[in-house]
Amino acid sequence: MNNIFVSATNHGFDALAYLDGLPVDRVHQVHLAGHSQGRDLLIDTHDSPVCDEVWALYENAMARLGPVATMIERDGNVPPLKELLRELWIARKLGAHAQQVPQDTRIAEAA
């Protein structure tokens, strides 16, 4: 999700439109991460918390995809366990919404 957000921001395309174009039946895992602000662009560094915009994109993805495996990546600046568990709680909370949306609806919306 962060890669989509970073690329969309840096290259000026719509992240939700990109997400709409993904083949729902081929997505089996979603990765969440943070990024850093470079001089002129965002850098997908996986060394900061997941930002609000990426959480919103993730929530949208879960509504479209349904429950899929989700990994929170933190390759640097690893915070205390309490902060990681907070991100896990957010991911689970947002992902729970996907279980309330019938699969036929998700596929129809993605088509």
Spans of model-derived segments:
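Conserved active-site loop/cleft motifs that coordinate metal ions or position small ligands
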Residues: 69-75
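Glycine-rich phosphate/dinucleotide-binding loop and adjoining beta-alpha-beta core of small-molecule
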Residues: 111
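C-terminal helical cap(s) of enzyme catalytic domains, especially alpha/beta-barrels
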Residues: 81-107
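Short, well-ordered coil/turn segments that N-cap beta-strands
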Residues: 26-28, 65-68
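A short, acidic, amphipathic alpha-helical segment used as a generic capping/interface helix at domain edges
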Residues: 15-22, 49-64
